[in-house]
Curated annotation (Swiss-Prot):
Component of the cytochrome b6-f complex, which mediates electron transfer between photosystem II (PSII) and photosystem I (PSI), cyclic electron flow around PSI, and state transitions. This is Cytochrome f. The 4 large subunits of the cytochrome b6-f complex are cytochrome b6, subunit IV (17 kDa polypeptide, petD), cytochrome f and the Rieske protein, while the 4 small subunits are PetG, PetL, PetM and PetN. The complex functions as a dimer. Keywords: Chloroplast, Electron transport, Heme, Iron, Membrane, Metal-binding, Photosynthesis, Plastid, Signal, Thylakoid, Transmembrane, Transmembrane helix, Transport. Residues 1-32 form the signal peptide. Binds 1 heme group covalently. Heme binds at Y33, C53, C56, H57. Belongs to the cytochrome f family. GO terms for cellular component: chloroplast thylakoid membrane. PANTHER family: CYTOCHROME F, PTHR33288. It comes from Cyanidioschyzon merolae (strain NIES-3377 / 10D). It is found in: Plastid, Chloroplast thylakoid membrane.
Length: 300
């Protein structure tokens, strides 16, 4: 009896360990799906002003960035990145099937500006420990996040000497859909297949095209699932000529806006000055009216 129970316990323990091991393997790709730029670039903005996401998302699609014109120290405010696209469009997924578009965004803030500590969204992350002023999000479902609202907090120059009461620039980048390249230069299946040689289409199979070169050699090129062929058997083709239609329906865009970190003392002084000028003008008008009445009474 004890032997039987021991065997059953061993089977149960082995099953649980196997489940955990397989589950861990399956979960790793999900957990290891960060913004690819974080893995390949120390800074998301190049010296030319180009945001590095454009190196993998080759198509260009505009985005909009909305921020307040000015903020006060320690003020919490919101920046909105609008990533618009046709919801009826479907993108080519990694498995060759069609699915909805995902979106992602990066917001590059001035030094000292941070993600609001009151933000409860699990999707926002800082780009790195060295760049806490750069906020990233994605990939997230495009149907829900065509507008991404970043909750932010302005710095206080009285406590942070690296910050000043001046005008700053805020940069944003946003993409919809999958990229065409990986950071290592490898193409994804979300890009057209180009001919690697000159020649003639010798044969078309289910997942490959065989090209007969001008020298008589046969070159086979794989065609990912979900692609639509543009060529037919017997057709003469050139090197780098598209063999399939471009499956990409997404694209990347970037925008820039300016924001002023206002000095409260200067703002109060300006308001006091405006009030003083208004009172002075009002007193002048009243005095003028009084003089006119006196002159009118003397004439009568």
């Amino acid at each position: 009896m004890m032997t039987y129970l021991s065997k059953q316990f061993s089977k149960l323990l082995f099953g649980q360990l196997l489940f955990l091991f397989i589950g861990n393997l399956l979960l790793k790709p999900v957990q290891a799906y960060p913004i690819y730029a974080q893995q390949a670039y120390a800074n998301p903005r190049e010296v030319t002003g180009r945001i590095v996401c454009a190196n993998c998302h080759l198509a260009q699609k505009a985005i909009e960035l909305e921020v307040p014109n000015s903020v006060l120290p320690n003020q919490e405010f919101e920046a909105t990145v609008k990533i618009d696209y046709d919801l009826n469009q479907k993108q080519l997924l990694g498995n060759g099937q069609k699915g909805g578009l995902n979106v992602g965004a990066v917001l590059i803030l001035p030094e000292g500006f941070r993600l609001s500590p009151n933000s409860r969204s699990p999707f926002f992350n800082t780009y790195s420990e060295q760049l806490p002023n750069v906020i990233v999000i994605g990939p997230v479902p495009g149907e829900k996040y065509r507008e991404i609202h970043f909750p932010l907090k302005a710095p206080d120059p009285t406590t942070n000497k690296q910050v000043h009461f001046v005008k700053y620039s805020i940069y944003a980048g946003g993409n919809r859909g999958r990229g065409q390249l990986y950071p290592n230069g490898q193409k994804s299946n979300n890009a057209p297949v180009l001919a690697s040689v000159n020649g003639v289409i010798e044969q078309i199979r289910e997942n490959e095209v065989v090209i007969k070169t001008d020298q008589g050699d046969l070159v086979s090129q794989a065609i990912p699932a979900g692609h639509t062929l543009l060529v037919k058997q017997g057709q003469k083709i050139q090197n780098e000529q598209p063999l399939t239609m471009d499956p990409n329906v997404g694209g990347f865009g970037q925008a820039e806006k300016e924001i002023v970190l206002q000095n409260p003392t200067r703002l109060k002084t300006f308001i006091a000055f405006c009030v003083t000028v208004f009172i002075g003008q009002l007193a002048f008008v009243l005095k003028k009216k009084q003089v006119e009445r006196v002159q009118a009474s003397e004439m009568n």
